[in-house]
Amino acid sequence: MQRLPRTVPLKQAMGMMLTGRRVGAQEGLKLGFVTAMVPHAKLMEEARRWAGLILECSPMSVRATKQAVMRSLDATSLQEAMNNLSYPAYAAMAKGEDAIEGPKAFAEKRKPDWKGR
């Protein structure tokens, strides 16, 4: 309940929450809380595509992003969320081997070899 008004326009969020109205996938896509819509037969293919895209990223970067996003949802304002620098996963990522590997791979025009450390 606390997250929906941060995801979709307030009036739409209130309408859904106060009435319990069900929202279909197409409307969810339009409102922005559905990422993609595919036929049922293509569901696993699309899920694997998304997983592949995520797996191409540094595991430490994915972890830090998830931590920052989830913790920022608890902030009372955008400013508070932006000022909160106490994300342990981000600090670990910034000091890790992958922080060196990413720019190095980019400069060498090759795919990074993420170590997750």
Where is each model-derived feature located?
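CoA-thioester-processing core
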Residues: 1-17, 30-31, 46, 50
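Terminal peptide-recognition signature
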Residues: 4, 28, 65, 106
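Helix-capping/helix-break motifs at membrane-protein junctions
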Residues: 9, 39-40, 95
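Helix-loop "lid/cap" segments that line or gate small-molecule binding pockets
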Residues: 16-17, 68, 72, 88-94
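Acidic, divalent-metal-coordinating active-site segment for phosphoryl/phosphodiester hydrolysis
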Residues: 20-27
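C-terminal long alpha-helix characteristic of the crotonase
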Residues: 25, 34-81, 114-117
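Interdomain hinge/lid region at the active-site interface
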Residues: 95-99, 105
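Terminal low-complexity tails and localization/encapsulation signals of metabolic enzymes
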Residues: 104-117
